[in-house]
Amino acid sequence: MTFISNLINGISLGSVYAIIALGYTMVYGIAKMLNFAHGDVIMVGAYISFCITTYLKLPPVVAIVAAMVVCTLLGILIEGMAYKPLRKAGSLAVLITAIGVSYFLQNVALLIWGSAPKTFSSVAPFNSIALFNGQLIITAESIITVIACIIIMIALTLFTKKSKMGKAMRAVSEDKDAAELMGINVNVTISLTFAIGSALAAIAGVLLCSAYPVLVPTTGSMPGIKAFTAAVFGGIGSIPGAMLGGILLGIIEIFSKSYISTSLSDAIVFAVLIIVLLVRPTGILGKKITEKV
């Protein structure tokens, strides 16, 4: 039962990484930039949810919606103030700005909520499930996380392929200048992309802290890095790739902790990424990019 339990835990953790990675892959796929402050938006969403449930005593559903609203507005604000002026700047300028935004959010959280860890309450509306006379426990958080991941991936896929705004996003992703000539508002499209990615980060933050109920200002840092790794692993810019990469990364991490070493699990995860990129630089489901000369 240990193997099955580890597999379930890996899929659950990987589903969180997948939801975060979807935010990365959407922003990169459409705006062609990497938002390394994405992990800290996760932290903000978790803190908002914590305040709603702990201080206002409102239901978890209200807390999740509030976290999504705040993070959506935060994502639009970050894009407008930090990234929009750098649209034509080099990638190094964007990277430095993203790191600066990340540290800014962490320090603001430190000023508001302090450095003491906060205990996060579970958002699950039902109890864990015990199977085989209690030998296998499937937590309610795991079930909710996996279901949420599947729903989000399907919804995003349908949105990008069927909706008018989704088609506009794909057009901007292919060629910004051509999309603008066709009447698409590129600025609004990119802002909407950041908004969606930040809303997903809020959901991921709540799910992550519900499963691992300790909340500090740096909560989103490592999950953010691992989710970026998952996005690259699966093929950054690909929605199914983000989900596949996240789940595989979660499984590798949990099995590494269980069968090899807890202290080496992160190193193993990143080593696997390096091997995959050496064999397939675009990731598992990434498309090969060709340039015409």
What are the residue ranges of the model-derived segments?
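Hydrophobic core segments of alpha-helical transmembrane domains in multi-pass membrane transport
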Residues: 46-51, 67-74, 101-109, 148-157, ...
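Membrane-embedded helix boundary and interhelical linker motif in transport proteins
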Residues: 8, 30-77, 81, 86, ...
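Short, non-helical or kinked segments that cap or interrupt transmembrane helices
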Residues: 15, 24-46, 60, 88-93, ...
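Transmembrane alpha-helical segments in multi-pass inner-membrane proteins
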Residues: 57-69, 194-201, 207, 211-271
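Helix-loop-helix "hairpin" substructures at the membrane interface of multi-pass membrane proteins
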Residues: 13, 135-215, 239-244
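Alpha-helical transmembrane segments within multi-pass membrane transporters and channels
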Residues: 24, 57-101, 108, 244-249, ...
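Transmembrane helix-bundle core of multi-pass membrane transporters
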Residues: 86-162, 189, 255, 260, ...
